[in-house]
Amino acid sequence: MRAIISLFLISAMVFSMIQAVPEEXGLQLSEDERGGCLPHNRFCNALSGPRCCSGLKCKELSIWDSTCLG
C-alpha cells in the first residue's frame, strides 16, 4: 500500500515539474515584449500604457487623436 502511495506522489511531482516549464517560458516572452512593439498587431503591449508602434519602438499617443507623436 505504501508503495502505491509513494508511486502516486512521485508521479504527481514529476507532472507538476513538467507543467511548470512552459509557463516560465511564457513569462519570459511577455517580459521581453513589454518594452517593444508586439509583432502580431503592431501595437505596444497593454502594460506600457497608451502607446503605438513606430518601427520597432513604442511612442506616446496624442491625447486628441490616435496618431503617434514623433
UniProtKB/Swiss-Prot annotation:
Disulfide pairings: C37-C53, C44-C58, C52-C68
Tissues with expression: Expressed by the venom gland.
Compartments reported by the entry: Secreted
Predominant location category: secreted
GO molecular function: toxin activity
GO cellular component, one term: extracellular region
Propeptide: 21-34
Residues in the signal sequence: 1-20
Domain comment in the entry: The presence of a 'disulfide through disulfide knot' structurally defines this protein as a knottin.
Family label: Belongs to the neurotoxin 01 (U2-agtx) family.
Protein name (record): U2-agatoxin-Ao1m
Species whose genome carries this gene: Agelena orientalis
